[in-house]
């Protein structure tokens, strides 16, 4: 422990170590000067550096004359307690930066100023500037595209040239007259026996237009029936023919007519009196019934007796 304390000696600040603010340059990251390992960071003034150089120099070397005017150059940091290799590396890095800044011409604009120290932008490499300037001045260096020759120029025999130099300019009225004359000639050339389709008549009156109507088959059938009946009536009146309803005569018709009470129709019949063919014609009753079909099992005569002699009944058990 004693050797370690002897190796790391802390020097008290003296008047020579106190420097004005314009000669001290610290970075933003070096806010605290105290290090955990006890290493002290000090900024050395030109006078201190000159004194140290005299102490380091031998007795044979001529003493360097101290300069009373302090230099404005910013001195690098000096870390005590570090190895010489690290110090040399740090000095070489800062020397390269300073030499690069000195090589830049003073005419370059300043980008920013921090702590009264100017930082200048490095000059662009000279190889890029001429290439850009040449490309801008000369523009596109590609060869110009040659347009092909049109076919009507290279082969005029394939084309026919039309010109309107001989045609005089006409007015609107002359154009209208020419159009009307052309239409009239076309209408005269059309055939007269032309029959248009239905609803295709070009005239406004619409003559010959086909009109579709709903077919009436039932009415035509009724008219035909009426016409046939009229012909039959006329022929009957001329020949004095009588209409006979003998097909409706019979016992069932008599029963139905007597039950319904409908009028009786007298029909002459020669078979009623066979003894006298030349005498008066006999009369026969005929009954009419409706179109509705009825079962005749439910009808019976009023005068008929179910237990009469005409009825047949089986033996009672």
UniProtKB/Swiss-Prot annotation:
Annotated region described as Hom2, given as residue ranges: 74-101
Any GO molecular function: protein-containing complex binding
Region described as Disordered: 1-78, 123-151, 247-317
Keywords for the protein's UniProt record, in alphabetical order: Acetylation, Cytoplasm, mRNA processing, mRNA splicing, Nucleus, Phosphoprotein, Spliceosome
Region (Hom4): 198-238
Biased composition (Acidic residues): 1-19
CC per GO annotation: cytoplasm; nucleus; spliceosomal complex; U5 snRNP
Biased composition (Low complexity): 20-37
Modified residues (Phosphoserine): 57, 64, 83, 92
Compartments reported by the entry: Nucleus; Cytoplasm
Positions of post-translational N6-acetyllysine modification: 214
Main location group: nucleus
Hom3, as annotated region: 147-183
InterPro entries on file: TSSC4
Region (Interaction with SNRNP200): 146-300
Example GO biological process: spliceosomal snRNP assembly
Family membership noted in the UniProt record: Belongs to the TSSC4 family.
Quaternary structure annotation from Swiss-Prot or TrEMBL: Interacts in a RNA-independent manner with distinct U5 snRNP-containing complexes, the mono-U5 snRNP and the post-splicing U5 snRNP-PRPF19 complex. Interacts with SNRNP200; the interaction is direct, excludes recruitment of C9ORF78 and WBP4 to SNRNP200 and negatively regulates its RNA helicase activity. Interacts with PRPF8; the interaction is direct.
Reported function: Protein associated with the U5 snRNP, during its maturation and its post-splicing recycling and which is required for spliceosomal tri-snRNP complex assembly in the nucleus. Has a molecular sequestering activity and transiently hinders SNRNP200 binding sites for constitutive splicing factors that intervene later during the assembly of the spliceosome and splicing. Together with its molecular sequestering activity, may also function as a molecular adapter and placeholder, coordinating the assembly of the U5 snRNP and its association with the U4/U6 di-snRNP.
Protein name as annotated: U5 small nuclear ribonucleoprotein TSSC4
Organism of origin: Rattus norvegicus (Rat)
